[in-house]
Amino acid sequence: MREEQPHLATTWAARGWVEEEGIGSATLGRLVRAWPRRAAVVNKADILDEWADYDTLVPDYPLEIVPFAEHPLFLAAEPHQRQRVLTGMWIGYNERVIATEQLIAEPAFDLVMHGVFPGSDDPLIRKSVQQAIVDESFHTYMHMLAIDRTRELRKISERPPQPELVTYRRLRRVLADMPEQWERDIAVLVWGAVAETCINALLALLARDATIQPMHSLITTLHLRDETAHGSIVVEVVRELYARMNEQQRRALVRCLPIALEAFAEQDLSALLLELNAAGIRGAEEIVGDLRSTAGGTRLVRDFSGARKMVEQLGLDDAVDFDFPERPDWSPHTPR
């Protein structure tokens, strides 16, 4: 996306900087100071050594969250075919996480680091966002490693081309209808903020699952720990930026929020069809067709607690047109 945004060519140093009045968030300061103790990149860089316990009889992905797990045609498939689907869904899960980091979260962080929004030149905001960017690079590495090791251990020699990340497709559609650069910047910021406040719900689906490969749970647990902090950072940063936006920018942010929430929650049925076909499951089209007609069958993420907190912090409870569901028991935001 950078090539579409020439205004990012100048670094923040070229403009100087100033501590913004009112940006002294105790929460943000605490999160910045905790980074050396919390960040996976600092404390778990030797993750490559954790693969010794891989057991080929243990599934790669939780059957419980497979949306077609109880479909008669899936149950009628051979055990090795069902296992191949679970492995493919684990690889696809990692691919989705990587794409979310690279296409959604990092471009939003880049806008903040380049001082695009009033208040984003503040040193505390810059430091917190830069720490998050370092984290995201390591997360991408962890999930790339997960894909490579799974391919090696499961002896998978090929994978069909995958569809573009559905969340990003929805963002590009929104950007195409926005003639003004400032409005496109707001949309990118909102998509990134939603990703960073909701991705922990996606990670929690696997992080606390005891039925899958221990290494898969470890990777998602480490990522979840970082993203829990990122969610809090993003809430604080967006609140500070929103307070300094003009009315046009604020209205654009409110318009984008529900669209971004729906986009992040969406289950890409075309990706599921690819996994079923790759495993040779008979009736793959019928399985996906039945899923499409099922209530909730097209929704992957069902926990929006982090995004809901952001909306509340912005004072937009009544302005954002989105039906937030009840927080599920497995939510990372549920007190333990």
UniProtKB/Swiss-Prot annotation:
Impact noted for substituting residue 136 to A: Loss of activity
UniProt pathway: Antibiotic biosynthesis
Catalytic activity field: 4-aminobenzoate + AH2 + 2 O2 = 4-nitrobenzoate + A + 2 H2O
Details of cofactor binding: Contains a nonheme dinuclear iron cluster that stabilizes a peroxo intermediate. Was originally suggested to contain a binuclear manganese cluster or a heterodinuclear manganese/iron cluster.
Effect upon mutating residue 135 to A: Loss of activity
Binding site for Fe cation 1: 101, 136, 139, 223
Disruption phenotype: Deletion of the gene abolishes both N-oxidation activity and aureothin production.
Listed GO MF terms: identical protein binding; metal ion binding; oxidoreductase activity
Sequence intervals crossing the membrane: none
Subunit details: Homodimer.
Function: Involved in the biosynthesis of the polyketide antibiotic aureothin. Catalyzes the oxidation of p-aminobenzoate (pABA) to p-nitrobenzoate (pNBA), an unusual polyketide synthase starter unit. Reaction mechanism involves the generation of a peroxodiiron(III/III) intermediate, which effects the initial oxidation of p-aminobenzoate to p-hydroxylaminobenzoate (Ar-NHOH). Ar-NHOH is then probably directly converted to the fully oxidized p-nitrobenzoate via a four-electron N-oxidation, bypassing the formation of a nitroso compound.
Listed name of the protein: 4-aminobenzoate N-oxygenase
